[in-house]
Every structure is written in C-alpha cells, then in structure tokens.
C-alpha cells in the first residue's frame, strides 16, 4: 500500500507567529477564533505571511452497492444526474465555488453511468459503483489503492496549479451509510446513535437503515478479516469517492496545503484517515457542524472546532465553502493589519 509522509507542521515558527498576532493593533486575543486560524494556517504553510492563492475544490462522485438495500430515500440515478448538473454550473457547489473563487474539479471515481461524453468530468472510474457491503467487501485491495491514488493525483494537480488551500466534497447516493458505520467502528459508538435520516428518511426508513447496517457489521466481523485493521474497515464499507477524498487529504497534507473539511461524509473520512495518520488533523479546518445526526459528535471525536452552524446537510463540500470568508479574514488579519509600532499606537499590554 502507498505510504504517505505525514507529520505535524514544524513548530519552530509558533512563537514568532504568536508575537506577530499579538502585536497587531488590537487588544490581545480580541479577534478570537481568527487568531487561532491564522496561527494554524501559518504553521501549515511555514510562514508569517500566509496566502490562499488559487483555492481548489475537488468533488469526487461514485455510487454505492448498499443503495440496493433501500437505505436512501434518493434513487441511485441522482448521482449521475447531479454530476451532469455540476458540469452545467447548476449545483449548490457550483454557486459557492463561483462566489468564493474556487476552481472546481469534478471527478468520476465510480459513478454507475457512462459520463465519458462530458469533458468537464475527469474520468477516473474504478467500477460502476462499489460492491454491496451487506454481502461482500465494497472494494478490493487493488480498488482501494486505485481510489487513494486518484485522490492523491487530484491534490497534486491543485498543488501544481499553485493552490494553497483545497476543499473536498462528494456526490454519492447512500454514502451516509458507510459514514455511519465508520463513525460507529472508529468512534466506538453504538450504531443506533450513528444512523440518521440522510437525504430525508422517515422513522421507519431510519429503522430499516439501521437493521441493514447492523447486519453488514455482523457479516464483516464473521468475514475472517482483521476487524481491528483500519484499512480493512475503510475498504470493506467505504465508497470510491470517500477513499479518493482520503487520498486527496493525505497528499494535500504532504504538500502543506490547508484542507477544508465539509460535513458528515467528509468528517467521517477525516476520522478514518486520522486513524492511519493522526497528525493529519493539524492540516484540517472544519467548516461547519451540520444537521445530519451524529455530525457534531464526530467533530467531537476529532477535537474539531467547526466555524459555522447553519443546519446544512447538502454535502458536495458546500458547508466548507461557506466558511471560506472566515478563513480568508484570518489570513487578511495577519497579513494586512498594521502593528502598534507602525501605526504609532501605544502598546498598552
């Protein structure tokens, strides 16, 4: 398996960054969370003058075999229909990318539809959806590696374009199901506390979803695989788009890019990848606490402090994109505000 070189950002500049922030012409600590963000971004980029050049949004799309079990209110074809919609600029993700100046890369990692005629969709299809993890592993070891490589390739493309920051989103009907299982297994949380409505299930739908996922976990535990192995859990239940997102996160951290994390699905990916490389969390900014059941609890498992709480549950990376102006403000604070000396203001503390 590909190994990534992930370490905490070097701390040698920490005190110099703190001193710069504290000497800006404001009361010490008065810009609160923005000061914390500025420190984090400076450490990621290893500079006292960070930038957010060429922001890039990666959107990975794929289908899930578990959808066949009726765990989602949305039909399977919504995945490919939305992928096409994104090429026409009509999705929520398109609007927020335009608003905040992000370049959008749309990547087919495993959509159950032929999208080859759409040149704005990058074709990295591994298969027409994953296997049904109620009965078998969602993907093989080889497919897992392929998906990681696709994500790393796309993060490399952003880095080579001069990006300092990437956002990652997904499109895949039924992908709250593997996310709920990852939350349960990686967080040691009872499954019933991890299963929510997804795109809009009613109480009976949630009950059915729980029963399917619970049986899938039982089958996994009797499969003969090492059920404590993180990568086994990821590939047995995960989607191609989710593993690609993990690969993108890992390569982005290697490149010292700021990683914007979205909602329930992407936070599940963050938990999964943190079990492989714990230091990666230091490269992540969590955009929001969403409305999908369990998201706030997942954020707590990571010790994350989300920037927004707007009741969002669309996915696609939209919640993270909404938080970008706050991140931008943090960078502008440390790069554009004057300090006490240059402003001829008495430093009174």
Predicted regions and their residues:
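N-terminal loops that bind phosphate or other acidic moieties
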Residues: 1-349
């Amino acid at each position: 398996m590909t190994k990534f070189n992930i370490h905490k950002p070097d701390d040698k500049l920490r005190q110099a960054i703190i001193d710069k922030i504290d000497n800006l012409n404001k009361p010490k600590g008065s810009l609160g969370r923005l000061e914390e963000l500025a420190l984090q971004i400076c450490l990621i980029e290893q500079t006292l003058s960070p930038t957010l050049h060429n922001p890039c949004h990666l959107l990975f799309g794929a289908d899930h075999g578990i959808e066949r079990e009726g765990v989602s209110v949305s039909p399977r074809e919504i995945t490919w229909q939305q992928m096409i919609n994104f090429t026409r600029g009509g999705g929520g993700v398109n609007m927020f990318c335009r608003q905040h100046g992000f370049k959008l890369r749309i990547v087919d990692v495993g959509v159950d539809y032929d999208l080859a005629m759409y040149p704005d969709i990058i074709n990295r299809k591994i298969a027409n959806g994953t296997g049904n993890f109620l009965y078998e592993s969602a993907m093989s070891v080889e497919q897992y590696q392929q998906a990681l490589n696709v994500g790393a390739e796309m993060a490399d493309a952003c880095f080579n374009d001069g990006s300092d920051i990437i956002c990652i989103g997904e499109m895949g009907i039924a992908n709250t199901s593997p996310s709920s299982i990852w939350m349960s297994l990686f967080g040691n949380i009872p499954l019933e506390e991890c299963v929510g409505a997804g795109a809009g299930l009613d109480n009976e739908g949630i009950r059915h979803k729980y029963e399917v996922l619970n049986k899938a976990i039982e089958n996994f535990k009797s499969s003969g695989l090492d059920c404590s192995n993180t990568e086994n859990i990821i590939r047995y239940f995960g989607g191609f788009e989710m593993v690609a997102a993990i690969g993108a996160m890992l390569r982005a951290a290697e490149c010292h890019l700021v990683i914007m994390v979205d909602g329930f699905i992407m936070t599940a990916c963050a938990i999964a990848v943190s079990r492989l490389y714990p230091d990666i969390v230091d490269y992540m900014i969590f955009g929001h606490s969403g409305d999908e059941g369990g998201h706030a609890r997942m954020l707590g498992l990571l010790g994350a402090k989300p920037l927004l709480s707007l009741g969002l549950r669309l996915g696609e990376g939209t919640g993270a994109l909404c938080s970008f102006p706050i991140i931008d403000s943090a960078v502008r604070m440390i790069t554009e505000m004057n300090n006490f000396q240059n402003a001829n203001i008495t430093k009174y503390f």
